[in-house]
Amino acid sequence: RLVPIIDAGVKIEEGYDVYEEGVEKNYFCKRQDGSDFVAAVWPGYTHFPDVLNPDARKWFGEKYKRLTDAGIEGFWNDMNEPAIFFTPEGVKDVKEAMKAFIDKEETVQDVWAIRAQVTGLANNAEDYASMYHNVDGKMVRHDQVHNLFGYNMTRAAGEGLREISPDKRCLLFSRSSYIGMHRYGGIWT
């Protein structure tokens, strides 16, 4: 049996139908200025579906149909804290710090400061604070509802799979979770 890994990030790629539809319907998490939040994970730059928005959650759950139509009955939700490897803003800051570093004699402190900045790109608190969800028509910072993202991604999958295959019980487990997630799937630890 095949159990594919489903990551939260939707690859930013012109012509990719899931990406195009998500942008068109405004289903992705936002920045404070209303633009789509961009972060890099395995496929490169991505947008995260706003699974706290009921319409976006339903849409994301429906995307499992193309996989169930291919005979797949098990799913592993991963990277759904959501994990962030880096953002364009974080990389820009590191590049600027490196430019300042290149033209001077390095010290141990300088090297450790650069190292800390590079290793701090992943899952950076500032990135989570700059990502927003649509909760009942209000913009809510991700860092205030962080634990609900993995829960709602699993909820999207669980509800979608029940609608797609009401007479089947699909295998579904998730890396990230929250209280009550057991209604929709198991947790991978």
Identify the residue ranges that each predicted region occupies.
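Catalytic-domain carbohydrate-binding cleft regions of carbohydrate-active enzymes
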Residues: R1-T189
